[in-house]
């Protein structure tokens, strides 16, 4: 996937000051974001990295159906405390199926289907995300070694497949609530996420 660096700026946030960089696919116009801290000079060791797919409902509207918003905020806090790290914010709403289909899937979940079956009932993949842009974004930031903040083993393998040296995994268990317990259980049981049983 050809993407190009197009803009950067400082970004003060409630969790500390970061740099925000925008990368664009010149063919589709799709824009992805790197929110970084402490990378003004090339890092000399592994860097905290989270690959976070866009979730309008969770990130912007504080939806309780998922754990995306709390994960994003917890990562910003973690990186700010560490003084170095990057969030790759990928524009892949609804695990890559888009906002409209995501809301259609939500309607099916309201009828009792889990997050996997809801997608499949719409004739869509359970997870349609891609990660081929990550290596270009990390290369631009001079990040060579990664401590990946994730519970998803597929992300670890996807980054390794891009030639990224993932040296460690940092678990992230936040945002559990009565509305998303079934969703989190489904991610563990059907999508192989690395939650512990006592996380639920």
From Swiss-Prot:
Keyword Manganese: no
One function term, GO molecular function aspect: GTP cyclohydrolase II activity
Single GO biological process annotation from the record: riboflavin biosynthetic process
Keyword Hydrolase applies: yes
Cofactor comment: Binds 1 zinc ion per subunit.
GO CC terms, sorted: cytosol
Cofactor(s) this protein requires: Zn(2+)
PANTHER family: 3,4-DIHYDROXY-2-BUTANONE 4-PHOSPHATE SYNTHASE, GTP CYCLOHYDROLASE II-RELATED
UniProt record similarity statement: Belongs to the GTP cyclohydrolase II family.
Protein role: Catalyzes the conversion of GTP to 2,5-diamino-6-ribosylamino-4(3H)-pyrimidinone 5'-phosphate (DARP), formate and pyrophosphate.
Protein name: GTP cyclohydrolase-2
């Amino acid at each position: 996937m050809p993407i190009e660096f197009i803009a950067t700026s400082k970004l003060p946030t409630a969790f500390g000051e970061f740099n925000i960089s925008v990368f664009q696919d010149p063919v589709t116009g799709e824009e992805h974001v790197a929110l970084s801290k402490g990378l003004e000079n090339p890092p000399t060791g592994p860097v905290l990295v989270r690959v976070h797919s866009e979730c309008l409902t969770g990130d912007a509207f504080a939806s309780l159906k998922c754990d995306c918003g709390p994960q994003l905020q917890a990562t910003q806090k973690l990186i700010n405390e560490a003084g170095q790290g990057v969030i790759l914010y990928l524009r892949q709403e609804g695990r890559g199926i888009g906002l409209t289909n995501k809301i259609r899937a939500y309607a099916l979940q309201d009828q009792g289907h889990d997050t996997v079956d809801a997608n499949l009932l719409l004739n869509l993949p359970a997870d349609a995300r891609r990660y081929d842009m990550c290596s270009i974004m990390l290369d631009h930031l001079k990040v060579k070694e990664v401590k990946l903040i994730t519970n998803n083993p597929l992300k670890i393998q996807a980054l390794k497949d891009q030639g990224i040296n993932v040296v460690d995994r940092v678990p992230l268990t936040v945002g559990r609530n009565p509305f998303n317990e079934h969703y989190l259980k489904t991610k563990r049981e059907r999508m192989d996420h690395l939650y512990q049983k006592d996380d639920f």
